Design a protein with these regions (language model features):
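Short coil/linker segments at helix-helix boundaries
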Residues: 1-52, 57-145, 152-165
Length: 165
């Protein structure tokens, strides 16, 4: 897989595979650059290298869902269904592997069900966004010094009022 190098930012995750760590970091960099499709491709590559990597599943789940630039209400019905299915399925993979993750990784993973409480779409996902922001507030309270937690918590709040900052 060809890769455009965005830099050396890293977040150490629970994985025995250095190459899975590398591809997770690449996915995180693309995620923070709002190229979610490329982020997902990198997280999937990390999973190829370490199928037990809970955080690679977390990355896919997080990146497949809504964001400040593409909130749920801007998806067309087919796109919303596909995104939710991908996010929900990856979340299940992360949850199934969470026991082997670090405490902060487990907290990030265990916040995801508030973001994706079901696989089927509903008319208005705004309550899901609010529930996820509440879940991330608790993760933040327990991990105030963690930069990723700060980022994900801040983005969860931003997603409550997309394009209104």
């Amino acid at each position: 897989m060809e890769y455009y190098d965005l830099g050396s930012y890293t977040r150490t995750i629970t994985t025995p595979a250095p190459d899975a760590q590398l591809w997770f970091d690449r996915g995180l960099n693309w995620l923070y650059g709002f190229n979610h499709a490329e982020a997902i491709a990198c997280f999937q590559k990390a999973l190829e290298l370490d199928p037990g990597c809970a955080m690679a599943y977390w990355g896919i789940s997080y990146a497949a869902g809504p964001n400040y630039n593409l909130p749920w209400h801007l998806y067309d019905p087919a796109g919303k269904a596909a995104a939710l299915a991908a996010a929900y399925d990856a979340m299940q993979g992360a949850l199934a592997r969470a026991d082997g993750a670090s405490p902060v990784e487990r907290a990030l993973i265990r916040a995801l069900p508030a973001r994706y409480p079901q696989r089927e779409t509903i008319e208005d996902q705004a309550p899901w966004d609010a529930a996820y922001a509440d879940a991330m507030r608790e993760v933040f309270r327990a991990n105030r010094d963690d930069l990723e937690v700060r980022h994900v918590f801040a983005e969860s709040i931003m997603n409550l009022t997309p394009w209104k900052m």
